[in-house]
């Protein structure tokens, strides 16, 4: 027997901690990505206690992250509207931060976890063209390469359905 059910799909951004204090229940998502950067560098550089992190990104690359509480609140508002049934909603930050800003803020979080670094060095594609990058060899490097697309992309997700159902696009907290 076929049921006439409409399913609503939410495609969320990379979730980070709460807006007010950055709290996260676990570190399996974005923060894990940050730990991989540090671990990779430490394994390659003799476990130096403090060093710069090197990351290859486009000059103005953005990262589609959003605070978990903002995304949940937005999904609740959307679900309260009858016209949301059967639609797909991209729950994404309408003004995503640049990678360099995000990494600087992330280093503070990692510092609270006992992972110390001394700043961040962002390399752009201009420099990448001049240098040769080796193929990832270690398991940590291979795992890190899985996340490289997130660091390099400048994707923007379409929030059109959110705007259509709510009549506006809620601002993400800064």
Placement of each model-derived feature along the sequence:
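4′-phosphopantetheine-dependent carrier domains
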Residues: 1-15, 70-73, 79-82, 90-97, ...
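NAD(P)-dependent short-chain dehydrogenase/reductase
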Residues: 2-63, 68-73, 77, 106
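Mid/C-terminal beta-alpha module of Rossmann-like enzyme folds, strongest
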Residues: 73-146
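Conserved short-loop catalytic and cofactor-binding motifs
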Residues: 59, 90, 150
